[in-house]
Amino acid sequence: MKTYLTLWFSSEGTEPTKVAERLQGMGFKPITGQYDHVYDWKDTVALHQILKLCTSVHQTLKGMHVLYKIETV
């Protein structure tokens, strides 16, 4: 499974490079195309694990004035 992250930045928020560094520290990799970052689980995961990652993303981006969308497939 993979979790994809799409980001929307504000000119009043944190610089995109700093946001990307934070997300990379969590295990996300920047990509090009439809999504901005991907987290590769390398296997099937339970819903509670996905929700735990979503909570971590939320806390990491808090205060950075970044909107985001998470999709796991």
Model-found features: residue ranges?
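Long, contiguous binding/interaction regions
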Residues: M1-Y4, S10-V73
